[in-house]
Amino acid sequence: MLDKMKQFKWLIIVSFILLVIPLYLTFKNSQESSTLKTAFEKQDRVEVLHYLMASEKYASQIRKAGYIIPSDGAIRLDGVIYPLEIEGDVHLKISPPQKDAKDFQLFFVTQVNDKQTYVAFVLDKDLNLIYSNYSQDNDSGKREGASISQSEEDRLLKIVRGEIDGFMENMYRILYA
């Protein structure tokens, strides 16, 4: 009789654990999804990029939207989606922002004054330019810093903002429409 009581207690404990774990995982997943939707609605692009790129969770939806990301195996190996590529007027490569970051980095190559120019931007959540860097290959093939006019920088920033805003709209539509 004592053995049956002990087995019954273990059965209750195991059943409880098997019930609680899926409920906890469902709650956590729901909470994360809610946080992402809130970030979209606040237009906090840094937070949205962090949640989308922090793991392979949204990889299939990003691919479905037509964006280029590494294979699932590479994402699992790196722990993040790096890079997220947006092909448009310029081919953006976005680095994943850290949790609670205030900015994010992106890179692309474009033509400035008939020379191939490598561009790095650091943008905040409102897509304001925090930092920019430009480089070009010199005649001997070494990359060196370059400068561009303010109007050219403004033109490039406008293109980048349009591409990122388009990405945000597409992802919101795919995830929540």
How should these model regions be labeled?
Residues 1-7:
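Short, Lys/Arg-rich N-terminal segment immediately upstream of the first membrane anchor
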Residues 10, 41, 45, 53-58, ...:
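Generic surface-pattern signal
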Residues 85-177:
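Extracytoplasmic electrostatic interaction patches
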